[in-house]
From Swiss-Prot:
Keyword Nucleotide-binding: no
Protein's name according to its UniProt entry: Ciliary microtubule inner protein 2B
Tree of life domain: Eukaryota
Protein's organism: Mus musculus (Mouse)
Keywords: Cell projection, Cilium, Cytoplasm, Cytoskeleton, Flagellum
Gene field: Cimip2b
Location in the cell: Cytoplasm, Cytoskeleton, Cilium axoneme; Cytoplasm, Cytoskeleton, Flagellum axoneme
Keyword DNA-binding: no
Tissue: Expressed in airway epithelial cells.
Listed Basic and acidic residues bias regions: 123-159
InterPro entries: CMI2A-C-like_dom (IPR018902)
Role according to the record: Microtubule inner protein (MIP) part of the dynein-decorated doublet microtubules (DMTs) in cilia axoneme, which is required for motile cilia beating.
Positions of region (Disordered): 59-85, 123-164
Length: 273
């Protein structure tokens, strides 16, 4: 007959006890008082089996089993391309998208996922039942559809990609729709109209201004620079402006020096005194 070993690992079998400073857990230690640490732990360790140290055939906690993920048959799921996320089990913390899961509350992750997938597959099956297969149409209906598609005029791609700036002033599409947040020239000077009407007027004014600017090809000559006011007179003291050549003048008053500096020509200023 096999004997179960109930001795505690790391302690002697005759007088088991813990020494002061032991930081491990000793059950029921906090409910014992009036004795030393070694005596209390010795009594607890020598007590009935399972009181402080469970025997080998007993456990403190029941075995923990992980919850099973709900199993959904792969045949019910719609065909998918790429990753088969909908046909695989998920764990709590999954951040991917689960169809219909945002409408289910007060359940754990596995229950929400199972119910959401069942609802999604049911809705998908109903949609497929209402859709007729392509082979159900007669040849005449297919020919009519193809003929109708051929008769439809192609979209004007140039009109769709044309900018209101390049359109003619008489074009009815020369405006920006309400909600446009880009810059519209001359629009800030117009008021009292809807946004399409306002932008149409602004674009027309902008185009007229650009056309007038292109018409004037010859630039206007620049006006001659004005001559100094006090060209032939001396300046008053404390004048804060710039006087060309004044810093090279010495031995006179401010009025005399500025009169001499302003009266001399560039050639005279370059000649040595």
């Amino acid at each position: 007959m096999a004997v179960v070993n109930t001795s505690i690992p790391g302690l002697s079998g005759e007088n088991p006890h813990y020494i002061p400073g032991y930081t491990g857990h000793c059950p029921l230690l906090r409910f014992s008082m009036g004795q030393t640490y070694g005596q209390v732990t010795g009594q607890l360790l020598r007590g009935p089996p399972g009181l402080a140290w469970p025997p080998a055939h007993r456990t403190l906690l029941p075995p923990i089993q992980s919850p099973r993920s709900p199993v959904i048959s792969k045949g019910r799921l719609p065909p998918r391309r790429g990753h088969e996320r909908l046909s695989s089990s998920i764990i709590p913390g999954y951040t991917g998208f689960i169809p219909r899961a945002q409408f289910i509350f007060a359940k754990n992750c596995n229950q929400v996922w199972a119910e959401a997938m069942s609802e999604f597959t049911r809705r998908h099956g109903e949609q497929e039942s209402h859709q007729l297969p392509d082979g159900a149409k007669g040849e005449r209906e297919v020919e009519e559809d193809q003929l109708r598609e051929a008769e439809e005029p192609p979209l004007k791609q140039e009109l769709a990609h044309a900018s209101p700036y390049s359109m003619d002033d008489t074009d009815p599409h020369k405006f920006f729709m309400s909600g446009f947040t880009g810059y519209v020239p001359r629009a800030r000077f117009l008021f009292g109209s809807s946004f399409p009407v306002l932008t149409n007027q602004a674009l027309q004014e902008f185009g007229q201004m650009c056309s007038r600017g292109r018409a004037h090809k010859d630039p206007k000559p620049l006006s001659p620079l004005p001559r100094p006011t006090f060209q032939n007179l001396g300046l008053l003291p404390h004048y804060g402006g710039y006087v060309p050549g004044y810093k090279f003048q010495f031995g006179g008053t401010f009025g005399h020096l500025t009169h001499d500096a302003l009266g001399l020509s560039i050639t005279q200023k370059q000649l040595p005194a």
